[in-house]
Amino acid sequence: ATVTATTPVAAHPHVWIDAAPEVIFDEQGRVAALKMRWTFDALYSSFALSGIDANKNKVADPDELAMLAKQNTDALKDFKYFTLVRKNGENVPFGEGVSAENIVVDGALVMTLNLPLAEPIDPAKHHMSFASFDPTYYIAISVKDASAVSVVKAPAGCAAQYSEAGEAPQNVSDSVVNNLSDNWAAQFAPTITINCNG
C-alpha cells in the first residue's frame, strides 16, 4: 500500500495529502534540508494501515510503520519525493541520507520525509524556492497556508514566503491525465520562497 500504488478509482486525484514543510538551516545560515510532514486522507490512511497489519492485531506496530516508510521512500525516489527545489531557477537534487518516519495521529497516517539537499543553499545569496506536487496528479498535495510552513535555526531576517497556486481541479479522468505534460500539476502547487533580508 505504497503512496504511489494504484487504486480502482476512475479519476484523479486518488489520494489527498495535507503538507506541513519545515525548512532546516545549518550553522552557516544555509538551507541544508527540508522536512516534509504529510498527513494522508482518511481513506488512504485506512487502506494503507490495514495493508501493513501483518500480525492482524488491528494496530499499526512500530515495525510495520517503519516498513511502510521504507517502501514509500523507495517508491518516491524516482519521483524526487514529490518535492522540487530550485536555486536561481535551476533544479536542486537531494543528497544522501533521505529517510522517513510514520506515525498515526487520530487514525490518520502521518509520514515525515527528511530530505537533505545535495549542497546547502545560502538564500541570502541565491534565490531559493520549493514546491510539492505529484507530476501524475495521482496525489493532490496541499499546503494550507503560510502558517503550515516553518523554519528551523533560521538567521535573523530569514523567513519563508508562501505563494498560493491555482485551485486544483477535481475528478480529472485518467485518459486526460495521461496526455498532460509532466509540469501540468506544478501549476496547482503552492510555492515556498526563502527570503533573507539580513
For each predicted feature, which ranges?
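Mature, soluble, non-transmembrane domains
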Residues: 87-198
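Early extracytoplasmic/domain-onset interaction patches
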Residues: 12-40, 44
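Domain-scale selection of a single, long terminal region
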Residues: 1-2
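Short, hydrophobic/aromatic beta-strand segments
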Residues: 33, 46-50, 123-129
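Boundary at the C-terminal end of the N-terminal hydrophobic targeting segment
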Residues: 5-11
